[in-house]
Amino acid sequence: MLSPKRTRFRKQHRGRMKGISSRGNRISFGKYALQALEPAWITSRQIEAGRRAMTRNARRGGKIWVRIFPDKPVTLRPAETRMGSGKGSPEYWVAVVKPGRILYEMGGVTENIARRAISLAASKMPIRTQFIIS
């Protein structure tokens, strides 16, 4: 699973996802890509599941680039804990994704192989996505 090696602070505010993605919204490595159409937090497990699905489907052909990185810690309180007594401890990491953001890129394969592999990755994502070609 992806996570930062070290961070400046252990915990972060939740924040809000306004607007569309101004960075990472163009294909820059491969020829085919998966683009987000909705705002969401995508966990490191979901990113890894999508990457594995694409890799298995492509079978030694082509190259895959993961364009998002989970750099936001999500904290959880233990079950049946009373209110108060501070913020919970970091449990998992998420990538903040806005509409227009490229999630995965693929190159070195034919379009139908890329379409099939990327649709498998899309099914692992918690948001609506679209397949795009550069």
Swiss-Prot record:
Q: Output the Gene Ontology cellular-component terms.
A: chloroplast; mitochondrial large ribosomal subunit
Is Plastid one of the keywords UniProt gives this record? yes
The record's subcellular locations are: Plastid, Chloroplast
UniProt keyword list? Chloroplast, Plastid, Ribonucleoprotein, Ribosomal protein
- Please give the InterPro entries that the UniProt record associates with this protein: Ribosomal_uL16 (IPR047873), Ribosomal_uL16_bact-type (IPR000114), Ribosomal_uL16_CS (IPR020798), Ribosomal_uL16_dom (IPR016180), Ribosomal_uL16_sf (IPR036920)
Q: What Pfam family does this protein match (any one)? A: Ribosomal_L16
Which top-rank group of organisms is this from? Eukaryota
Instruction: Share an example GO biological-process annotation for this protein.
Output: mitochondrial translation
Residue ranges of region Disordered? 1-21
Keyword set includes Transcription: no
Q: Which GO terms describe its molecular function?
A: rRNA binding; structural constituent of ribosome
Q: Cite the PROSITE patterns for this sequence.
A: RIBOSOMAL_L16_1 (PS00586), RIBOSOMAL_L16_2 (PS00701)
For bias kind Basic residues, which ranges apply?
1-17
The family line of this record is: Belongs to the universal ribosomal protein uL16 family.
Checking NCBIfam families in the record gives: rplP_bact (TIGR01164)
Assembly behavior = Part of the 50S ribosomal subunit.
Q: What is this protein called?
A: Large ribosomal subunit protein uL16c
Q: Which organism is it from?
A: Solanum bulbocastanum
